[in-house]
């Protein structure tokens, strides 16, 4: 879902040369971080709405748990979906700044997000250490976001935030040096 929302964060406007008109009124960092922040706010709103709809549906249909527990479960699940989506959003932003067009950006983002676990699983058939390729993206630790141990959750959240920071830095660096 994130790849389809973030793949054209910058690529379409870079390809059509529309960003050069914004450069008269704003600097590159403001454009980069403004668009990224806007996408993150939209992503949080969509995931919150999704969590609310699922919770209300399960609460009305099943009725097996009290509403307080259901809302806490939904809050935790939604928060973890947001946390795991941040690195993918930043990765798509980086790819979008580097790609020459929208379709190229979508293709590269899909290959990166889907290719990492595929490469890890196929590579681990031959080499056991190839499974560590999963750690390039949150694939390696995203299942620990819903772990019962707070330490495991904290480490997974920290890993997602660290990857987000790295991808945002790479995207910003690429955007600053890119010909718009």
Cite the ranges covered by each PLM segment.
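Short, solvent-exposed coil/turn segments
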Residues: 3, 14-16, 152, 168
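Residue-level signal for alpha-helical context at structural boundaries
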Residues: 24, 28, 49-50, 67, ...
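Membrane-interfacial segments
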Residues: 11-14, 18, 53, 57-66, ...
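Terminal transmembrane helical anchor/hairpin motif
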Residues: 106-177
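Helix-loop-helix units of permease transmembrane domains in multi-pass membrane transporters
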Residues: 9-40
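Secretory targeting signals
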Residues: 1-8, 33-103, 150-153, 158
